Amino acid sequence: MSDNKTEEYWSRFPDTYDEKMEYVVGKELLDEIIQELNRLPELGELVEFGCGTGIYTETIVPKTKSMFATDLSDSLIAVARTRIGNHPKVTIQKENCMATSFQSEALDSVFMANLIHVIESPSTLLQECYRILRKNGTLVIVTFTDHGMKLWDKIKMGLRFVKSWGKPPSHTHSLSLEKLASMMKDAGFTIQKSKVIGNKTKALYIIGQKDKKA
């Protein structure tokens, strides 16, 4: 699926996007994600990839000196602009996370939530994160997974997804914590924290630092 097709898939329901996400994975998991993000330290100058409607932008921005909230979808960006308003620390703009307009070593931190598992080439995305981060920069990833879920819970979540979104994109991945950590290491990151969060539904939460030798 091309970048344009991916954009079209996730852009179909901008006004109900958050409700659909909560229906599929549950409010409990979303609340746990917010709790983890609230524990993050200062993140400096940050870019958020796949900001969607800005649901996590609100949580991340207090941790930053300034931030870019970016997405490939015009319709989701429009919702994010309404949600965030004219926040003095936030610049909302359209970006392709696989090939951004940011200069090399321009930012202190990269944050993405529920993006890498729907990207056709996660390794390309991680390489772009590495490129734009300053030395010792921080990469924070949260992404849904079915690893560690009971079979019946997987089935029910799958049915909720199809009911909400239809057939998932063919390149959707369900990454394990070990696989994602390995991919990040291959891209030049040292893993600082990694865990699986959630009960009936799950998400990976992992923080990496750009290799000090970079």
Feature-to-residue mapping (PLM):
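Class I SAM-dependent methyltransferase SAM/SAH-binding core
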Residues: 47-99
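C-terminal alpha-helical "lid/dimerization" subdomain adjacent to the S-adenosyl-L-methionine
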Residues: 142-187, 192-197
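Core SAM-dependent methyltransferase catalytic element
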Residues: 187-189, 193-214
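A conserved beta-strand element that flanks and buttresses the S-adenosyl-L-methionine
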Residues: 111
